Amino acid sequence: MSRRKQAKPQHFQSDPEVASLPRRDGDTEKGQPSRPTKSKDAHVCGRCCAEFFELSDLLLHKKSCTKNQLVLIVNESPASPAKTFPPGPSLNDPDDQMKDAANKADQEDCSDLSEPKGLDREESMEVEVPVATTTTTTTGGSGGSGGSTLSGVTNITTPSCHSGCSSGTSAITTSLPQLGDLTTLGNFSVINSNVIIENLQSTKVAVAQFSQEARCGGASGGKLLISTLMEQLLALQQQQIHQLQLIEQIRHQILLLASQSADLPAAPSIPSQGTLRTSANPLTTLSSHLSQQLAVAAGLAQSLASQSANISGVKQLPHVQLPQSSSGTSIVPPSGGTSPNMSIVTAAVPTPSSEKVASNAGASHVSSPAVSASSSPAFAISSLLSPESNPLLPQPTPANAVFPTPLPNIATTAEDLNSLSALAQQRKSKPPNVTAFEAKSTSDEAFFKHKCRFCAKVFGSDSALQIHLRSHTGERPFKCNICGNRFSTKGNLKVHFQRHKEKYPHIQMNPYPVPEHLDNVPTSTGIPYGMSIPSEKPVTSWLDTKPVLPTLTTSVGLPLPPTLPSLTPFIKTEEPAPIPISHSAASPQGSVKSDSGAPDLATRNPSGVPEEVEGSAVPPFGGKGEESNMASSAVPTAGNSTLNSPVADGGPGGTTFTNPLLPLMSEQFKAKFPFGGLLDSAQASETSKLQQLVENIDKKATDPNECIICHRVLSCQSALKMHYRTHTGERPFKCKICGRAFTTKGNLKTHYSVHRAMPPLRVQHSCPICQKKFTNAVVLQQHIRMHMGGQIPNTPVPDNYPESMESDTGSFDEKNFDDLDNFSDENMEECPEGSIPDTPKSADASQDSLSSSPLPLEMSSIAALENQMKMINAGLAEQLQASLKSVENGSMEGDVLTNDSSSVGGDMESQSAGSPAISESTSSMQALSPSNSTQEFHKSPGMEEKPQRVGPGEFANGLSPTPVNGGALDLTSSHAEKIIKEDSLGILFPFRDRGKFKNTACDICGKTFACQSALDIHYRSHTKERPFICTVCNRGFSTKGNLKQHMLTHQMRDLPSQLFEPSSNLGPNQNSAVIPANSLSSLIKTEVNGFVHVSPQDSKDAPTSHVPQGPLSSSATSPVLLPALPRRTPKQHYCNTCGKTFSSSSALQIHERTHTGEKPFACTICGRAFTTKGNLKVHMGTHMWNSTPARRGRRLSVDGPMTFLGGNPVKFPEMFQKDLAARSGSGDPSSFWNQYTAALSNGLAMKANEISVIQNGGIPPIPGSLGSGSSPISGLTGNVEKLGNSEPSAPLAGLEKMASSENGTNFRFTRFVEDSKEIVTS
């Protein structure tokens, strides 16, 4: 058709039909009034002014010419705006009448539901694909959809007639009910303007003008020439061949899936309200055939599409009931607007779907226009109803929704879901018989269109909404065809599939959704649907019982939107079956199943096949109301048969499946469409999927890398193995220096840096006894052990003194020695603090060793204390030396003293376990001579190696403190046998003769240690002895190493100047012995008690004669270098203690805790403290073993009743005592210790050493006589037995008291809770 522009185009009114045709002037509403035609034969195109002598030519031209959806339609009725065309055309002309009716209908529709119209158009287009396509141009709703049909039909009349025209047949054959009737029914107010601003779906146009008269005059439209309509329908049919093919495929599917298909085909008859004016013209026959096909497809499509369209359209329809139409076939027609909307296809469709609906729904369809709408081709009906349809209901073109490409279906599905939601909401407030679809504002619809009905989230597109919905339904439509894993999005599947590329390069990824229910459906090949290779996952047994589903036929494999299957589950669950309409058309089962109002069908769409049922039954589903109607009607009719016929069979008559299968089958069909037929997929049902997810929560412990205790899934077996250590407390990696154990080698390596930076050794690198210089701290420690072992004299050695000996004993001794040092607190903590059986040490060995040379271990306990005390008095340097000795061997400082003191200590300890310090000091004073110490050793066989041990042994006699962990000292030699080695060397170097000298077991708790020094230090955990006291703050420490480390916390200026003076002037034995004697005794006493203050008289007790003994004096004399001032000049983030620099203040702060021993983060469960919150969190994982899986995923709170764990620790007594003490001390083992039995066994519980630290750290010095059996300690510790029960609590309480009491000094209560880190409260 030429589009030549005439200089002076004229419209000849001579042809009233043409004159009456609305002129569509592009986007503007300029309807040019028809000019009087010069000749009645000439017809002018209102848009391009082209003249045609034949009306048919003009009509054909308009199809291509009138593409603009904005149509200016002149409303010739007085109510219409002034833009109405001149009255020239007579209404008598059939065309004019049709136009008038269409215009009126349009006006009403526009006035009431502008947007719904657009939706309706689209729907109608979809339904009446053949017709719609032709008219699409006019309507512009959805090209080639029902809407187009309407416009095509309307072209003659008006685009607004699209709804009526869509049902071209009905329009032609019968006069359509006036929309006015619907308006009255729907209580719609008619706007007097034929211009309506609405959001036309699938278009960019926002304004449409329709002739109200044309719409309203639809009743008279029946006079339209059938031939013209038929020609238009034919053209539309040709243009919509593809859609017809899709429809046909759907019909085949229905036939295959449901036995009801027979019913659907029966629908071909096209009853219409008025007698159909079918012309003999083959076009009529063709239209009827098309209508039949549509009826079949529409039956399904209507069930689905009309559900969606009708839901949207019906929703759009007010409470309109279609009284005019008979409950049966005229269901749709009843609405005045509806009839016109019903095209021939509509009329045809109404018969099967309408009749079914009518029969099933009965009057309900009438009562609910939605139902009737659904009964009529949902599309046409929707468009017809669109004026009344609810604009809020997003109306995906029903045809598109049902037949469109996957993408449209997806969008439609989302829209349908939304529509269903809207319907459900509307219906809630409407009478059951009345389909109340109230129009919502266009903005509301747009908003609601992409709004999640579960969480109310709004999305910018249907696809985004669809994907989001899967998060609620749990649907994962995309299946990996290699491993069977499912994904919610194709993108995720693509990413996952890359993993298989290497192993299966020849297998292509399946990009189509696979219904989830098919995963469990057995197939003839044994390979699950959607899988390229046999699945490793067994099929559920119940599914095995079901018939094998043959792969879907091509019809089944319609190129339906892959999303449909996924959507269907949503639809099923989310909305009544109607929502699934379009989607359900593709996979009706699913939709119907979940959404259908019918309890059976709707619920499970038991007739999994019921897609067809939906087709037939769906029609009833105009909205939820329709949905329910359809469910009821469809279920009874097609529904029942459908239920009986298995969808899987692929034939309507297929074997019936049990009801459970039907839903699955429906899902299968859904899946089938998307994936080259039916692809298997997991159950698509929302509820079933959610149910599976819930059920699987407790079944997921099958992951090979999942922790069976806390159900945490690790990345690999090695990670899992390390993770288990957090539960078991296993620490296989031990520090050779301090004996601390770690769960990973990396942590151990990190820990070694602490030793490298350890100020006491690193800064000095000189032997505190002989002042020999060493470049390696480890070598120095070994060297010190040699001193303690007697291999090297305890007198200052020339610088050139050979280090070979030191080296000899070094490694082994050093290891233990170091272990002793750091072990004392941290390591012991790691060891369980439990059983501490008394293990007598061989006294003989002790004696021998003592006599030959002071037993470093024994000495370390009490002697070391005395020596240290003396040294402290003499100078901090000496004290540090003693500390080193004591730390390494327990207290190696004064061998002689150690022997004596240990023996004495043993006595004193036995005297009063409560105040080991006092007893120790007394002991040391009493027995400085090796003989005494030897005797002491004899006293407690366990003390054999170390006199110190005697103290512990005696403590063991009197005290049975709470279990103390061996801590790092816990180098536990696997051999606990007590072998008394009388060799002084054996005693001195238990490490070397470990095999021979194995009596390194604790007499109290039975723990074995790698060396005597470790054992001696361990004993202090029982005795609470803290022989090493800080001269600055009077804090006591169990090992010299700890004291040295603590000294680093004091600024050099804080230390007494005497400490820096090497008391070398004093005779190695003489002076140091004398001076320290007094001070030492007092200090020792104080230290033992954990109190700095000691009465001078106590110091007097210490006989100077004892002090003179070489080893002691030498050690005392040998000046110990205090932590040297930082070698490096201060820098930013510079540690003043060790001179180490850090990149950040936080790192420095954490580092400083290694010097201060501060451990601000304590475990609220077991009380262990940590230097960093991260360590605490890791530690908290050790308690997970005692928690139920329910706690999984919950963050363990670092905060707890023990608020003191915070940066500003609260007083221990209140918090810790109440909590820990209450539990451990209360005697309710089940509440505290028992629950940590496993942990304790693995060193997770508090170590005795920790406890001792706590006691000592927090105990302010209280003056007491050396000989007095009672002391603050005694008060706190009582006896070992007491300690066992009350140690955690009593000491704390006492500590608090003491801390707040006498000592004017501010005592920091230190609790080495973990890894020798302290928690400090002041």
Swiss-Prot record:
GO cellular component, one term: nucleoplasm
Broad class of where this protein is predominantly found: nucleus
Localisation: Nucleus
Region of interest: Disordered: 1-41, 78-128, 578-659, 789-855, 891-961, 1094-1119
Ranges of biased composition (kind: Polar residues): 584-594, 629-645, 898-935
Protein name: Sal-like protein 1
Compositionally biased intervals (Basic and acidic residues): 22-41, 96-107, 114-124, 936-948
Recorded family membership: Belongs to the sal C2H2-type zinc-finger protein family.
Organs and tissues of expression: Expressed in the metanephric mesenchyme surrounding ureteric bud.
PTM annotation (Phosphoserine): residues: 591, 594, 596, 940
